């Protein structure tokens, strides 16, 4: 599978520079970091949340878990994990479990954990289980220019 179409188009529209990194098939973000030989703190993962107002994508390092209560309070919403059966409809150009953390490309409210701003480069799923996008922190932040920022991640 190629890069997810909506993500690729979004990156082109934003004029960001990136590389594609290929790795063996993986089943989790931590396994992806190991197989791609990259620090897990530099691999951004997405967690799709929902409430009565709609969907929110939380973006955080693969070495962390989301503090849902903290993010809900920050956004003044009653967020919960989105049910997995809704994801194929929302992300039709991606494989399940390999959703790129670029919710903005899908018209989704997106919030980035502040800890990602400390990394010199960011990697993220391209839409399948065998490719990553790699870009400098500045490029990633330019790509995510309309995303919110908060502290909601806790190391595992």
What label would you give each PLM region?
Residues 1-156:
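Extended, low-hydrophobicity, polar/charged segments
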